[in-house]
Amino acid sequence: MAKKKASIPFLSLTSIVFLPWCISFTCKKGMEYWVTNWWNTKQSEIFLNIIQEKSILKKFMELEELFFLDELLKEYSETRLQILRTGIHKETIQLIKTHNEDRIYTILHFSTNIIYFIILSGYSILGNQELIILNSWVQEFLYNLSDTIKAFSILLVTDLCIGFHSTHGWELLIGSVYKDFGFIQNDQIISGLVSTFPVILDTILKYWIFRYLNRVSPSLVVIYHSMND
């Protein structure tokens, strides 16, 4: 009976995390053929953002330089020039193919993530029973921890998220989110987010300690500040 009771929170957590992912993954596989066919049939020329447009234009400019080089090599034999033209043509076809694959990848991943968040939001509204079970289990688990362990955990998490060495971790995390949504990485935006997120989290943490922990467990606050110093 106790084992069955202990497995209920685990099943609730598993359903909350993996059920939306499984549904969105299934939708992605179902949409893949339709999106690919739609893109290739319509031959869409829509660029999803200015960064992608600059990237593809840069590649075309590189090919244009090769064509200009072709004109400068008129003294080469006709066979050599034909080989050069064939190579440039193949590179152009490959560039267009890569561009189409990138656009399809962007559309699929963006749509999949939107579906995932919609399902997760709906699940959080409709799946009240699972959330109540999970919340009670988390509160019971935290209640059984000593103040020292709680303070150590808070200190560890804060150092990982807003500590001196957290910058590289934030860059990897935001970069992976960019990639997951199918967008091209923008170093300027990532640098701005990396310099902003830790400050916001640090402010929220201090406010939480001041308003909540001081009221619930003053001894935990004392231990936390002692360890932090």
Curated annotation (Swiss-Prot):
Compartments annotated for it: namely: Plastid, Chloroplast inner membrane
Q: Which keywords fit this entry according to its UniProt record?
A: Antiport, Chloroplast, Hydrogen ion transport, Ion transport, Membrane, Plastid, Plastid inner membrane, Potassium, Potassium transport, Transmembrane, Transmembrane helix, Transport
Any single Pfam family the record assigns to this protein:
CemA
Coiled-coil features, chain-numbered ranges: none
What species is this protein from? Answer: Lotus japonicus (Lotus corniculatus var. japonicus)
Specify whether Transmembrane helix is a keyword of the entry: yes
| One GO process term, biological-process aspect | potassium ion transport
The record's GO molecular-function terms, alphabetically, read: antiporter activity; proton transmembrane transporter activity
The name on file for this protein is Potassium/proton antiporter CemA
One cellular component (GO) term of this entry: chloroplast inner membrane
Where does it primarily localize?
A: plastid
- Chain ranges passing through the membrane: 114-134, 189-209
Q: What does this protein do?
A: Contributes to K(+)/H(+) antiport activity by supporting proton efflux to control proton extrusion and homeostasis in chloroplasts in a light-dependent manner to modulate photosynthesis. Prevents excessive induction of non-photochemical quenching (NPQ) under continuous-light conditions. Indirectly promotes efficient inorganic carbon uptake into chloroplasts.
User: Taxonomically, which superkingdom?
Assistant: Eukaryota
Membrane topology, as annotated, equals:
Multi-pass membrane protein
Q: Which reaction does it catalyse?
A: K(+)(in) + H(+)(out) = K(+)(out) + H(+)(in)
* Protein's UniProt keywords contain Hydrolase: no
Family, according to the entry, reads as follows: Belongs to the CemA family.
